[in-house]
């Protein structure tokens, strides 16, 4: 009997149906000599620092660097029940072998291996490696199971990625948090260089100084020809005025036939980019929608970095294209002879081929698919048609005209064969897209022009323009930048380039938003003030996109067995150790960047009595000047940090639960002045200063009876 372990219940159900394991048990399915169960994502994770040493529990410079000699793992508390089921099944005497059926990729391999190892399983391991959840693909996959050892290098690469992220995250975050005090400054192996790219772009935008320039226009015979950029408006007006009612001589005409090749098929990153550009979907949303379609058997495996199909998929591609035209996706009747050969290239298919629809699109009721998923399915279908379509061909005309010794230029474009763009245009007309229309090039037909002909100038004008700053990143352009990071410094034979992988980039972006370092403004991704300051203080070794891209490339080499895992981890450990040695102290001015005072604690404001910093202490807010000013309590109630901040700014605060003779009550406290106080405790007189408040009472809500 074989135990099959999938990544999630829905996938396990699909596999069990094909295998004939139809009897439902507690946490698994059984039948036909198979047990089919599942993980729930990661069941096992790396242990926290305090699990290794008690000293590592405290955030202090002295405890750094934190580098475990032997890595420890622990079962996640919220998935412990399913882990126990899997452990019991692995040790079931009926089980002869275990089949890893988690997602066929680096992370899926890690999810299974950590569970398998944690359970102490030693039974033979096999690997199911498929790119589609169609029944035929699952059946073929089980007929061609591979030994688990074939994927040992992939597992080592996944483990290196996890341990490297832990080392850089734990040490980097703790180091810069304890140095700068105040709030936690989260550092990540991939998220920090991604943030650095956003900050670099934002700095260029903020420092950009726009400059006006002018262009003189001459118009006649349907033409609008323009001069070069002119910095002086008066000069532009003089040039335009000199050509009024004049004659323009055509001095140059260049006509060229140009073409745009069909696009490649989608890998995950290009799909995420288009979904963001056309529909405003975040990278994470697109991955979730595509994963759902994959589990519904409607598209192939989503976490791929390939844009081709393998050479043996020619028949599959033809059948899917026919299915697209026979489904409800595209109702337009067109004569189409797809060029399948151009999307086939086994040499450029890594673990998985490009994302395409499956034959299930003609078997299932597509009207039942949620709208967001339907948009992704339609995108994938449309891209398959575009990728196998004909070239988009157009005629380009560029002409120069001379009038009164000034050269004017005009250009035109005339499409004579729309080719693959026919499908793209039809797709865009079928959906309301959020595409920036300024990025699309319009067709502009020119009248017939010949060198030596003259054109009467019917009208002139001067237009004003301004130089433009770089554009803010959108998720579309950020994903592209992450994918290309470090490319200019890498040779052409390097396979993996960029920050993260197609499977991880969405989570990296979401983490930056969640941690408060990046905010979304419509489609734009903009670093927050904290994000800008964080990148300002971090060294290149943790924020350089190129260095991180180098690491990602090395992880790929680990997965191929070309670099030892120990070599990769040794480099990470050395970097972390050097980081701690190099950065051991910062100035008070630098600490103040993140709201920390000399003590390294978060500053809430200035003391109203002595002007010293009021900081957040272990037992509440207090004045570092030790002037006796009580700022952490008001009328016997301990104040929150936000209430203290408001008081120090002279604002009124709402305090609930104040004690009175008739019970507790709520009131607004408005600071008016400072007064002395004194009381005796345990025979000792305690004196100091406190706010004198004016009170306002909230209006009670009146209940309207019938």
Name what the model sees in each region:
Residues 1-162, 166, 432, 469:
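Intrinsically disordered, low-complexity regulatory segments
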Residues 1, 101-104, 181-184, 255-264, ...:
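Conserved short loop/turn motifs at secondary-structure junctions
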Residues 9-16, 33-36, 40, 76-87, ...:
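Amphipathic alpha-helical transducer elements in NTP-driven molecular machines
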Residues 93, 137-220, 255-259:
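C-terminal or mid-to-C-terminal helical accessory/interaction module adjacent to the motor/catalytic core
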Residues 233-266, 272:
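Metal- or metallocofactor-binding catalytic centers and their adjacent structured scaffolds
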Residues 2-3, 25, 79, 90, ...:
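Basic, low-complexity terminal or inter-domain segments flanking catalytic cores
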Residues 11-16, 180-212, 217, 224, ...:
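NTP-handling and nucleic-acid-processing catalytic cores
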